[in-house]
Structure formats: C-alpha cells, structure tokens
C-alpha cells in the first residue's frame, strides 16, 4: 500500500465486526446450501497446527501424507490434528477458489450506511442477506459504511434487485450507499501470513 500512497487521493477503512452471510456461491447459483455451525470457544493450537492450516489454505485437497512430510509429522498425526480443528470449529469448510468470471458472473461490492437499526432490524437484515439469491458475503463493519456486501450476479439488473429489496425492507434506514464492480483480483487468501507467523 505504501508504494501506491502518492497516487491514492482518498480511501476508506472498514473494519469487519460481525458476519451477516458467508457463501462460496450465491443462492442464485446453487439453490441448496447449508452453512456450517460455528463453535464459539477459545481453543489452543501450536506451530504444527498453523503449518497444517497454511498448507491446507494453499491446497485444500493436498494429501495428508504430503502435508505430514512438509510439517514433520506422521500422516496419522496430521489426520488427527485436522479432525480436532474441525471439531473445535477452527476448520469449518474446505472450499474451492472460484473463478466467477469463467462462469459468466461478476462480483460487485455494495457498501451501505444504515441509520436507526435496532437489534430486531439487524436480525431482519441478516435474514434478508442470508436468503438473498445474489449475496455471496456480507458483514457488519465500522467505518463510513456499516455494511459491506459482495454480490455475485449475471447482470447489473440483479444488483439493482438486491439493492431495491434492501430499500423496500428498510425504506428510511439506507442513508448512503456505493456500488463497486470487481475488475481484477490482486490477492485473496483464507489464511493471512500474519497468522502463520504466530
């Protein structure tokens, strides 16, 4: 980011504080999807677990014997550790990285600022986003915008369908919004390097 700083005139920082929705495909692409239950408890892990996670983040179908060679454990030990991480909610899914453009879909980011959302309305918003056929990922944020939504759509009409649905359910609450289209992906990771250095 520092290399680009002289060219950046304005930027916004949004800090994610809670997920609303998190899917691999929008419901318009795959009609049946059950989201994994996430366990909310603190679990311990060590450098071997982190090395296993780093390996899986780069290749989720890598054989456990190959991971075992990389991290200095037996294949049985890797299998046991992955099973434990699943049970403890550290690993919730093994997911492919999808080239949506190759499937003739586009990704849009919808940034919204809501006013006057009480707990009940936030729950309604979460339910709406989880059932919206175009929503891929949505989170509650802190910053200029308090909600960030990624839409996976075939055309701009589907973007407007989702936006109009939000306006219909929250007519007075949407105080500002911005729509961005993803042109090129520079980086996407499920396991940032800061975690692998712990």
Positions of predicted regions on the chain:
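A compositional/biophysical signature of low hydrophobicity enriched in polar/charged and small residues
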Residues: 1-198
């Amino acid at each position: 980011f520092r290399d680009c700083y002289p060219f950046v005139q304005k930027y916004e920082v949004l800090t994610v504080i809670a997920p609303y929705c998190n899917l691999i495909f929008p419901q318009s692409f795959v009609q049946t999807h059950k989201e994994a239950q996430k366990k909310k408890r603190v679990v311990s892990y060590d450098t071997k677990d982190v090395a296993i996670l780093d390996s899986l983040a780069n290749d989720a179908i890598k054989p456990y014997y190959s991971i075992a060679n990389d991290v200095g454990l037996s294949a049985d030990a890797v299998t046991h550790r992955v099973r434990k991480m699943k049970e403890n909610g550290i690993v919730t899914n093994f997911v492919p990285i999808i080239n949506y453009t190759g499937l003739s879909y586009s990704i849009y980011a919808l940034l919204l600022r809501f006013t006057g959302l009480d707990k009940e309305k936030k729950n309604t918003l979460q339910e709406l986003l989880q059932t919206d056929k175009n929503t891929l990922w949505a989170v509650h944020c802190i910053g200029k915008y308090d909600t960030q939504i990624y839409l996976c759509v075939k055309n701009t009409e589907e973007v407007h369908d989702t936006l109009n649905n939000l306006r219909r359910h929250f007519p007075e609450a949407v105080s500002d919004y911005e729509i961005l289209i993803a042109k090129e992906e520079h980086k996407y990771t499920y396991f940032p390097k800061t975690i692998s250095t712990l």
